[in-house]
């Protein structure tokens, strides 16, 4: 009622839900924990959770099976990815099986308010996005360590592991390991082991299809890791 839609098993406890800017939808068994402040529109997927004190600005879509905390503005986080702790994420899109460490933050607006450029796989260079607000785009199975800072319009590929003090470069190639001090190749076998361990925590595993996709991405993106 009043723009809030709860599916079976969904619950919101001791939180502020404001639907004057858009509807709020909670899928089956989704949860909004105590102290959250949510401005619609929000779609919270099945078995997803907003952790204590989370602040959400629409338009945002999360899940299924995502845990989200901190401050989130105009983002899409696809299934089984987590941003479970404090930190800002704005105007961003995360693929499946990503994890942002505690206090990961991203910039979504340049200090000079200029149009954002971002890495284009089509042109193999940085290209204008036509956007003044543009945050982080992160591929499946990528991770950030605690206190990671992403600059405006950063593109992170598939199965990358980003960590370290300072701002990493605005384009992190798939299957890279490192941060501001430089990156090295994240070997395919190790990346697959990490993916399998993460998926098994959710009762899943890297099957032949997933393995084939990741191997194909690994081979196709080799030129960007040189």
Give the ranges of each region predicted by the language model.
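Glycine-rich hexapeptide-repeat left-handed beta-helix
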Residues: 52-53, 59, 64-225
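N-terminal start-of-chain detector that recognizes signal peptides
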Residues: 2-3, 21-22, 39, 46-48, ...
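Hydrophobic beta-strand core residues of beta-sandwich domains
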Residues: 4-6, 26, 44, 94, ...
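Extended, small-residue-rich solenoid/repeat segments and analogous flexible loops
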Residues: 1-40
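Conserved hydrophobic/aromatic pocket- or pore-lining residues that grip, position, or stack substrates
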Residues: 10, 30, 48, 75, ...
């Amino acid at each position: 009622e009043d723009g809030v839609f709860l599916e079976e098993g969904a619950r919101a406890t001791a939180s502020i839900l404001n639907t004057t800017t858009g509807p709020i939808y909670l899928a089956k068994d989704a949860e909004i924990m105590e102290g959250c402040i949510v401005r619609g529109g929000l779609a919270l997927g099945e078995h997803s959770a907003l952790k204590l004190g989370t602040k959400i600005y629409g338009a945002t879509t999360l899940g299924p099976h995502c845990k989200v905390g901190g401050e989130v503005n105009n983002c899409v986080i696809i299934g089984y990815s987590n941003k479970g702790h404090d930190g800002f994420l704005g105007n961003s899109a995360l693929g499946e099986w990503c994890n942002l460490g505690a206090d990961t933050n991203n910039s979504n607006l340049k200090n000079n308010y200029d149009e954002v450029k971002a890495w284009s796989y089509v042109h193999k260079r940085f290209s204008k996005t036509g956007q003044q607000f543009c945050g982080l785009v992160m591929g499946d199975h990528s991770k950030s360590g605690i206190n990671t800072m992403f600059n405006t319009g950063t593109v992170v590929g598939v199965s990358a592991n980003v960590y370290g003090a300072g701002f990493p470069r605005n384009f992190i190639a798939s299957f890279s390991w490192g941060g501001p001090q430089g990156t090295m190749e994240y070997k395919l076998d190790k990346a697959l082991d990490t993916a399998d361990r993460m998926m098994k925590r959710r009762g899943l595993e890297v099957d032949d299809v997933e393995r084939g996709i990741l191997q194909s991405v690994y081979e196709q993106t080799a030129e960007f890791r040189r």
